[in-house]
A protein has these predicted regions:
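ATP/NTP phosphate-donor binding region
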Residues: 1-97
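A glycine/threonine-rich phosphate-anchoring loop and its flanking beta-alpha core
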Residues: 15, 113-203
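Generic secondary-structure signature for well-ordered alpha-helical cores
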Residues: 58, 159-163, 168-175, 183-195, ...
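Solvent-exposed alpha-helices and their adjacent loops that cap or buttress functional pockets
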Residues: 92-94, 117-118, 146-147, 154-158, ...
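Short glycine/serine/threonine-rich phosphate/pyrophosphate-binding segments
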Residues: 106-113, 134, 246
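C-terminal charged capping/lid subdomain of soluble metabolic enzymes
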Residues: 183-185, 277-352
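Active-site segments that bind and position negatively charged phosphate/pyrophosphate groups
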Residues: 198-305
């Protein structure tokens, strides 16, 4: 088991390893002293792990209540958020009680935002069950729901009390969902760690789960510790995301987040090569490694539709847009471009 300490406004530990769900009651009791726990999950994850977690927490002395919703991004809405707040109030949760988010990124984002706002803030614990959530969304305190106008447009920075990444849960993931998480794993190598990217290129999907997840969490820790509120270098973690969010929205969220980010990284790296910011060999290597992991390389969406959807992104500021660009493996930067130039960037990335 690997332990990583996150030193932000609220310090907490991230544990990565096998069998953590079996010990969740003891580990949660160390940080949450209240009487009641609300387990928030989607219907898919609940069917796999919900009853076992509920029993473990009940046996550990907690009064457990649960809230589930249909799996998928389409549930990360004001309506689901409102129902969750009502559930917490109706079950009498107080500020000394705790929410446990059991699931992927949608579950963590929604449960975290409810924790941040219910009674002006109660404790919550992240138990991510997808690779993507383990290496990205469960760490760093970003919580949010979607609005009709765009993704993650209502949210808060609110750190969890604990994160438990049980690698055993990865065995139940559909292949496509696991590969989604690989897009975020590869992002860390491209941004920060050429040695990690070399190892992933060699090992492919056989990579050691605990080692790689732990390394990604360490890299995320470094970014979050330096810039908790996403005003500077933490923005590098958005590599591929501005275009990726545009692809997700333009595709009516029928394209998964990981697949969209993978396409976003391809498009931006190709555009960087076309604009002279990186060597074409760098863009081609990124594409080749994404290919090794079976991540998509094409979209039938045109540059205009992607751009229109991307312009609602939070990284827009007036008539400019912040775009994370790749100059080399391990060397990325934030470029501010006019919003009317974004379509040309996307077109350049699509046309190569």
């Amino acid at each position: 088991m690997k332990s990583i300490r996150i030193s932000t406004s609220n310090e907490y530990d991230v544990f990565v390893g096998s069998g953590l769900l079996r010990n969740a009651d003891r580990m949660i009791r160390n940080v949450c002293r209240g009487e009641t726990v609300s387990i928030v999950s989607d219907d898919t994850v609940w069917a796999l792990y919900g009853n076992a977690l509920e029993k473990a927490l009940s046996d550990g002395g907690y009064r457990c209540v649960s809230f589930t919703f249909p799996a998928g991004e389409q549930s990360k809405t004001l309506q689901t958020y409102s129902r969750l707040l009502s559930h917490l109030a109706e079950n009498g949760l107080t500020r000394s009680d705790c929410i446990v988010a059991l699931g992927g990124g949608v579950v963590g984002d929604l449960a975290g935002f409810a924790a941040a706002t219910y009674m002006r803030g109660i404790d919550y614990v992240q138990i991510p069950t997808t690779l993507l959530a383990m290496v990205d969304s469960s760490v760093g305190g970003k919580t949010a729901i979607d609005l009709p106008n765009g993704k993650n447009m209502a949210g808060a920075f609110y750190q969890p009390k604990l994160v438990l990444c049980d690698t055993d849960t990865l065995a139940s993931l559909p292949d496509a969902v696991f590969r989604d998480g690989c897009a975020e794993v590869l992002k860390y190598g491209i941004l920060y760690d050429p040695a990690l990217l070399d190892a992933l290129e060699e090992d492919g999907l056989r990579f050691d789960r605990e080692t790689v997840i732990g390394r990604c969490v360490e890299l995320k820790r470094d970014a979050v510790t330096a810039d908790e509120y996403d005003r500077g270098q933490r923005m590098l973690l958005n590599f591929g995301h501005t275009v990726g969010h545009g692809i997700e929205a333009a595709g009516s969220y029928q394209i998964s987040h990981g697949a969209a980010v993978a396409m976003g990284m391809r498009i931006v790296s190709r555009a960087c090569a076309e604009n002279g910011l990186c060597a074409m060999t760098t863009a081609k290597r990124i594409a080749q490694i994404l290919d090794i992991f079976g991540l998509p390389d094409t979209t039938n969406l045109c540059a205009e539709r992607i751009t229109q959807a991307a312009l609602s992104d939070k990284k827009r500021s007036g008539n400019t847009m912040r775009l994370v660009v790749c100059r080399d493996i391990g060397c990325c930067d934030i470029l501010t471009i006019p919003t009317n130039a974004l379509e040309n960037w996307i077109r350049a990335g699509l046309d190569l």
